[in-house]
Amino acid sequence: MNTFTWNDMNSTAREYILMSKDVRDMQYRKQWPAPGDKTLIELVASENKALKFYLDLTENKRSSSLILGLSADRKSTMQTRVSDRPLIRLDYSDNLEVLRHRNPDGSLIVGTHVHFDLDGYGAKWACGIPGQNILKPKSYDFASLFWSFQETCNITDKLKVELSLGV
């Protein structure tokens, strides 16, 4: 596959992602999880309130070492799912070598990448940000990727997630 597009996605997953979603508890200020933690935000779609959507935010533990300064490799994940079915997931790292994913065809993706729900594979297939045209960040920094993810998943822009500097 050259460039992933909306048409490559499972049609039901695409329909779910494109549904307009709001925060179920109407609490729009959330905190990004601390290293080693996960935040689960329940979402509701106005088109079908029976569906249970979630935005999962995960901040992996960081391995820090003191070598003329502090070096902490950040690994974060944001995922939108319906019940227990992942629809789209973004795996982010500020160090290309820390984040690797092997696709079902054996190809290796290194660095920040996005998983899509594809027919026959679920969300096991990933590509780098430049290898798709679904998630369209203004830049590849963490904040821009998060806002683009939120927009792509059609999650209300009222939701504000505060990031900590976390070391």
Locations of regions flagged by a protein language model:
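Charge-rich, low-complexity N-terminal segments
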Residues: 1-63
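Broad hydrophobic/π-residue packing in well-ordered secondary structure
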Residues: 2, 9, 70-76, 81, ...
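Generic secondary-structure transition motif, activating predominantly at the C-termini of alpha-helices
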Residues: 17, 21-27, 94, 150-157
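Intrinsically disordered, low-complexity regions enriched in Ser/Pro/Gly/Gln/His and often acidic
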Residues: 23-25, 118, 140
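A short, compositionally biased
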Residues: 34-38, 68-75, 110-112
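Aromatic- and glycine-enriched beta-alpha-beta binding-site module
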Residues: 46-100
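An exposed acidic His-Trp-rich patch
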Residues: 77-134
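Acidic, proline/glycine-rich low-complexity IDRs
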Residues: 129-167
